[in-house]
């Protein structure tokens, strides 16, 4: 696979070090003046953005933050109040720089030079039992993905999220979204999560979510929530009721996740509603529809709808 590999984004990267220094200082200042610090951070990010995705994302963010009453300021203030600076910095740099900047460039290069459609992220559901052999296999798969430019991972381990944490800890240059149930947040899991800076916990939004997010806040762990939905739930989604309930827990993202069998029509409606709600800044959380965001970012990064499964890329 050596001929397909690029230099890893973190190798002797002066640009990353300089950006990280500025971001750390701005995050520290954000606790005193979140509105001004966020605007500075977004303006700086837009100024140094090289790729299409970053320029589009930060351009939109810049326009949104012109509204001084934006609920996203309150979201940022709340997040910075409980999450450790190192966690925000590591996760943000892994996602924004390693994945969407340098990793995206590696993916585009592979597409242009070798016509290989590498996905920008991978969704992985952990099997049970997740023994040592399977952990090693997953770690090798992630290492392979990183060599191709994949530095964002969606890990689903609903009942035993602790099983994923050893592998996550072995890949500190990647950003991991760990989808799980509140019931899976054992004492061991919470302690290990608190030690890792490259993971965002994404809790299922259900009757236990309030207690689950309270545990995460107490440990200073970055979190979002997800809401599984089916075709029959579309009216409730379009009413905005789910997002109104979710924002009370102050999640960074509130993610709609279509269940198996959900119709394409329902998914498109959910995605359109989430995008409109995001653009209009309706809630103190960032509403997204999972599959549509994955697809849109992939399009922006590589312009390729036919992206190969990582397991099928030879190397």
Please identify what each model-predicted range represents.
Residues 2-39, 43-55, 59-63, 266-315:
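Accessory C-terminal segments flanking Radical SAM cores
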Residues 51-124:
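N-terminal [4Fe-4S]-dependent radical SAM core
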Residues 121-136, 145-162, 172-210, 220-235, ...:
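Core AdoMet radical
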Residues 126, 152-156, 210-299:
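Conserved C-terminal portion of the radical SAM core fold
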Residues 141-145, 168, 193, 216, ...:
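Generic structural signal for hydrophobic
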Residues 163-181, 272-284:
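Short acidic, glycine/proline-enriched helix-loop-strand junctions
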Residues 164-167, 189-190, 267:
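A short acidic (Asp/Glu
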Residues 171-175, 190-203, 219, 240-256, ...:
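Structural recognition of alpha->loop->beta junctions
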């Amino acid at each position: 696979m050596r001929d397909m590999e690029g230099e890893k984004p973190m190798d002797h990267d002066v640009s990353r070090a300089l950006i990280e220094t500025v971001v750390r200082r701005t995050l520290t200042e954000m606790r005193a003046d979140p509105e001004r610090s966020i605007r500075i951070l977004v303006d700086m990010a837009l100024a140094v953005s090289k790729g299409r995705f970053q320029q589009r994302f930060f351009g939109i963010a810049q326009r949104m933050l012109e509204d001084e009453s934006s609920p996203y300021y309150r979201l940022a203030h709340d997040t910075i109040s409980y999450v450790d600076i190192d966690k925000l910095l590591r996760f943000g740099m892994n996602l924004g720089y390693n994945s969407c900047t340098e990793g995206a460039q590696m993916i585009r290069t592979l597409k242009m030079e070798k016509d290989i459609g590498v996905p920008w992220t991978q969704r992985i559901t952990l099997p049970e039992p997740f023994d040592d052999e399977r952990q090693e296999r997953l770690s090798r798969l992630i290492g392979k993905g990183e060599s191709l430019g994949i530095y964002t991972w969606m890990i689903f381990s609903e009942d035993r999220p602790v099983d994923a944490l050893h592998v996550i800890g072995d890949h500190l240059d990647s950003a991991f979204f760990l989808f799980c149930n509140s019931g899976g947040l054992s004492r061991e899991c919470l302690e290990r999560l608190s030690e890792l800076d490259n993971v965002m916990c994404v809790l299922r939004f259900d009757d236990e979510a309030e207690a689950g997010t309270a545990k995460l806040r107490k440990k200073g762990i970055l979190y979002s929530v997800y809401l599984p939905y089916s075709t029959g739930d579309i009216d409730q989604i379009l009413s905005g009721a789910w997002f109104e309930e979710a924002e009370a827990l102050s999640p960074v993202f509130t993610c709609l996740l279509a269940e198996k069998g959900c119709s394409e029509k329902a998914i498109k409606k959910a995605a359109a509603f989430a995008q409109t709600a995001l653009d209009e800044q309706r809630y103190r959380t960032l509403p997204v529809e999972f599959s549509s965001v994955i697809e849109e970012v992939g399009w922006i990064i590589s312009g390729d709808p036919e992206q190969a499964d990582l397991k099928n890329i030879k190397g």
